[in-house]
Swiss-Prot record:
Top-level lineage group: Archaea
PANTHER family listed in its UniProt record: PROTEIN MEMO1
CDD domains, sorted: MEMO_like
Record Gene3D superfamilies: LigB-like (3.40.830.10)
One Pfam family matching this protein: Memo
S-S pairs: none
Signal sequence, start to end: none
Name the record gives this protein: MEMO1 family protein Mbur_2394
Source organism of this protein record: Methanococcoides burtonii (strain DSM 6242 / NBRC 107633 / OCM 468 / ACE-M)
Length: 264
């Protein structure tokens, strides 16, 4: 079983406190089940990025499985790693989709728990799904240490192939923050430049803009994998539903950027 590594740090450890924190994140939002195929959500502490993430989660439909692509911040494990463990959070256990995982055997995506053991980027998304959908769903966590364009596209294509073979209803979630520790004005300018390419679903342009402006988004590979998989499964439209920064909460001059984007 994969035990939570950032409960009590990024989000509350107790069930009651966690539910209260997530309710705050959804304050003022209407929970709508739309025909969303993919999403981009941030992965900082809930007090900072939770309300932004909630804007995307509020639009997600109930699915059989949520494939969650996250960047590897720790450097541990395989370059592209899926988990097949049961994932525990303060809300309880969530099963991984082992059937979908088997369809990815022998691909660029390794089955490796080490990459996930101390990584927070996937973990922080699961309580949001539990809050909305209870325990009647599965997840397929994919941790990406390799985020180059060719790798990310291949990951997305392989996942889309497996999903089509499975016949399941699947939503793809990319976990990523945007600019890191830059002035508010620079974050907004750089992030919107990158977001425009994401909204256009233009993968080469995402990479070009990231490197042109040295934008420190940590999950550009997961975003690319999500967009690739979503497009392969019929997605044609995107929407930026919320943008914000850590400075909106802290008032600090150096901020981290967050975006909630949905793909339909």
């Amino acid at each position: 079983m994969r035990q939570p590594t950032v409960a009590g740090k990024f989000y509350p450890l107790s069930t009651k406190a966690l539910r209260k924190e997530i309710v705050k994140c959804f304050h003022g939002l209407e929970i709508m089940s739309e025909d969303v195929i993919g999403a981009v959500v941030p992965h900082a502490g809930y007090v900072y990025s939770g309300p932004v993430a909630a804007h995307a989660f509020a639009r997600l439909p109930k699915a059989d499985t949520y494939v969650i692509f996250g960047p590897n911040h720790t450097g541990y494990g395989s370059p592209v790693a899926m988990s097949q463990d049961v994932w525990n959070t303060p809300f309880g256990d969530v099963e991984t989709d082992r059937e979908l995982g088997k369809l990815l055997a022998g691909t660029i995506i390794d089955m490796d728990e080490v990459a996930h053991r101390y990584e927070h980027s996937v973990e922080v998304q699961i309580p949001f799904l539990q809050y909305l959908f209870g325990s009647d769903f599965k997840v397929l966590p994919i941790c990406m240490g390799m985020q180059d364009e060719d790798t990310a596209v291949e990951v997305g294509l392989e996942v889309a192939r497996a999903v089509k073979e499975s016949g399941k209803k699947v939503v793809f979630i990319a976990s990523s923050d945007l600019s890191h520790y830059v002035p508010q004005e620079k974050a907004e300018k750089s992030d919107n430049y990158l977001i425009d390419a994401i909204l256009d679903m233009d993968v080469p342009e995402i990479y070009r803009r990231k490197y042109e402006k040295d934008i420190t988004a940590c999950g550009y590979g997961p975003i690319t994998a999500m967009l690739t998989a979503a497009k392969e499964c019929g997605a044609k439209n995107t929407e930026l539903v919320k943008y914000g920064t850590s400075g909106d909460v802290t008032g600090d001059p150096m901020v981290v950027g967050y975006a909630a984007i949905i793909v339909k």
